[in-house]
Amino acid sequence: MPLASLEVGQHLYWQIGGLKVHGQVLITSWIVIGILVIVSVLATRKVERIPSGLQNFMEYALEFVRDLTKNQIGEKEYRPWVPFIGTLFLFIFVSNWSGALFPWKLISLPEGELAAPTNDINTTVALALCTSFVYFYAGFRKKGLGYFRKYIEPTPVLLPIAILEDFTKPLSLSFRLFGNILADELVVAVLVLLVPLIVPLPVMLLGLFTSGIQALVFATLAGAYIHESLEGHGEEEEAH
């Protein structure tokens, strides 16, 4: 296959009601969700007091996510947010690794080609918007209308900056994840075409590492934003 045959932005469109959606993103997202559900069911089907095998792995993953959430949100209020942070981390982690390990491009489609769900900007923007909604909800649930005082404290002059900050958070989350995963898959694809045997292997291993790091960064920032929403700048300063 010639290098010129590499394409970016080709999509399989599905018409659902009045909406036009990217079909290949839904397919790969369902596959990732299916993998997570199947592994979870198998790991918890026969729970033992002394875990082993898949149960041991899942308990380690749960402990990792719980510690991550606790470190970002704090001992007192982290528990309700473990499911959300854990879902984000596991979905992004498996999605990223699927792009590096699964031969999506061997599956032919009428248009476009399959790739990791996080290789599509729509997926990363959706994850970032969910995170934004959750940290707004967290602050509003705890403080009520008083949550919005942060926009005018310590002075109303900072209102535009505070609003701009709320817009830049989901933008940075979505474009960081999308850009890293897309760049990694493109680099591997180009190297496979040019030198198909040995050279791409180190890059693929590096891609697996960076894919895991991107999932960790996204989940860590989501936890940090929720903590900021729960505590607020003023309360954090008083605590110190």
Swiss-Prot record:
One of its GO terms (molecular function) is proton-transporting ATP synthase activity, rotational mechanism. It is a multi-pass membrane protein. InterPro entries: ATP_syn_F0_a_bact/chloroplast, ATP_synth_F0_asu, ATP_synth_F0_asu_AS, F0_ATP_A_sf. GO terms for cellular component: plasma membrane-derived thylakoid membrane; proton-transporting ATP synthase complex. It comes from the Bacteria. Keywords: ATP synthesis, CF(0), Hydrogen ion transport, Ion transport, Membrane, Thylakoid, Transmembrane, Transmembrane helix, Transport. The keyword Cell division does not apply. It is found in: Cellular thylakoid membrane. SUPFAM superfamilies: F1F0 ATP synthase subunit A. The chain crosses the membrane at residues 23-43, 82-102, 120-140, 186-206, 207-227. The keyword Transmembrane applies. HAMAP family: ATP_synth_a_bact. Key component of the proton channel; it plays a direct role in the translocation of protons across the membrane. Belongs to the ATPase A chain family. F-type ATPases have 2 components, CF(1) - the catalytic core - and CF(0) - the membrane proton channel. CF(1) has five subunits: alpha(3), beta(3), gamma(1), delta(1), epsilon(1). CF(0) has four main subunits: a, b, b' and c. This is ATP synthase subunit a 1. It comes from Acaryochloris marina (strain MBIC 11017). The lineage of its organism: Bacteria, Bacillati, Cyanobacteriota, Cyanophyceae, Acaryochloridales. The gene is atpB1.
